[in-house]
Amino acid sequence: MTIFDNYEVWFVIGSQHLYGSETLRQVTQHAEHVVKALNTEAKLPCKLVLKPLGTSPDEITAICRDASYDDRCAGLVVWLHTFSPAKMWINGLSILNKPLLQFHTQFNAALPWDSIDMDFMNLNQTAHGGREFGFIGARMRQQHAVVTGHWQDKHAHARIGSWMRQAVSRQDTRHLKVCRFGDNMREVAVTDGDKVAAQIKFGFSVNTWAVGDLVQVVNAVSDGDINALVDEYESHYTLTPATQIHGDKRQNVLEAARIELGMKRFLEQGGFHAFTTTFEDLHGLKQLPGLAVQRLMQQGYGFAGEGDWKTAALLRIMKVMSGGLPGGTSFMEDYTYHFEKGNDLVLGSHMLEVCPSIAVEEKPILDVQHLGIGGKDAPARLIFNTQTGPAIVASLIDLGDRYRLLVNCIDTVKTPHDLPKLPVANALWKAQPDLTIASEAWILAGGAHHTVFSHALDLNDMRQFAEMHDIEITVIDNDTRLPAFKDALRWNEVYYGFKR
């Protein structure tokens, strides 16, 4: 069972009684056929549920009201099969609090050139019925998604599926609880922010729990549970000699397993799906959680280091959005550069916490090595290189009056040399359009040093996310030019200032 099994999307047909009962019967028949086909053939992440026709203001308002209060409903897909006067939709749309997608399609793909008559024209009016619906959305300043294409078109299927993922993610975010073990890293600016504003805008809550509360749960873990988890480690990873059963770091592995089990129990008991740690607040823990965090991220939890709750929440959101898709999604940090003319590279990593979902195919290495930061015992961690190919890094920042999402499109490349002395997982990439423009644009826009890295999602996914949550998005890709980028930042300042 996946998170998408907990939700459904309602399929709503807009029409009116003007055309008579026979036309409405055909509309219903077409709708039933389309919904059945989409559910069986389109590989959508969650189920479409056909609702009764919306042919009057009261019917439409009732559907929108019910959708708003049904926890299983992630959003509405609306098809204007015939002309549906848009004033009928005003009350319903004014109370709808779920995402809305307008599927601009029609039942037939080709025109029946020899037999087309006015009955056919009246029945198949998406071409102008959809425009009427679009006007009322624009008039009410209600942004919604639009997908145009025949209902049998695979590209349309993919776009609807992508939107569904966003809709489900939005609903999940409304219930998301972020646990901060300790506070932010001292004196760091970008990881701080307005948690009340975040809950108002996105829905997720952020609260702090003392590390001592976690330590109590960690210390209560039984040796039997620890040994069972270490057996799992041995089947999934390549253990270095020091971490094997008679190795001198074996106890560190056992302690890492204890921390993982305790941390997961704490998160489950509290209903948390994202969390942060900080190396400055580890009182009672014997090592900085590394292996535990990596494995919890792989299970779908959001995480960020140094108390960075915005990135932790964004990682959870993107994990939900990408559920079931090929490729992984991880916490990441731009760590250091390789300057070489024509081949500038970014080496991304963190102290320990990179998600194995982005790893290359072979087994990760489980090792224990010294970590100078934090002042604790040497922590266990998984070491691996990352899959190659197109990816994105995304950052969510708090500008005081609004949130800005930054997205840089990147190309992950194979590490050209072994890294025998680097004891952490890492990713190597080329930033688009190049390192100079990408880094300068990122800095000018205020992007954080922490990001969410993803092979599974792309720029279109993040644009949809920004639109669905009504936040600013700043894009750095192969089309980026710094003068235009700076102008866009200035224009956005005016636009969002006006919106206040």
From Swiss-Prot:
Residues annotated for Mn(2+) binding in this entry: E306, E333, H350, H450
EC identifiers of the protein: 5.3.1.4
Pathway annotation: Carbohydrate degradation; L-arabinose degradation via L-ribulose; D-xylulose 5-phosphate from L-arabinose (bacterial route): step 1/3
Gene Ontology process terms (BP): L-arabinose catabolic process to xylulose 5-phosphate
Reaction equations catalysed: beta-L-arabinopyranose = L-ribulose
Annotated SUPFAM superfamilies: FucI/AraA C-terminal domain-like (SSF50443), FucI/AraA N-terminal and middle domains (SSF53743)
GO cellular component, one term: cytosol
Gene Ontology MF term list: L-arabinose isomerase activity; manganese ion binding
CC cofactor: Mn(2+)
Cofactor descriptive note: Binds 1 Mn(2+) ion per subunit.
Keyword flag Transport: no
Keywords assigned: Arabinose catabolism, Carbohydrate metabolism, Isomerase, Manganese, Metal-binding
Pfam families in the record: AraA_central (PF24856), AraA_N (PF02610), Arabinose_Iso_C (PF11762)
Entry superkingdom: Bacteria
Function: Catalyzes the conversion of L-arabinose to L-ribulose.
PANTHER family: L-ARABINOSE ISOMERASE (PTHR38464:SF1)
Quaternary structure (record): Homohexamer.
Family, similarity comment: Belongs to the arabinose isomerase family.
Name of the protein described by the UniProt record: L-arabinose isomerase
Organism lineage string: Bacteria, Pseudomonadati, Pseudomonadota, Gammaproteobacteria, Enterobacterales
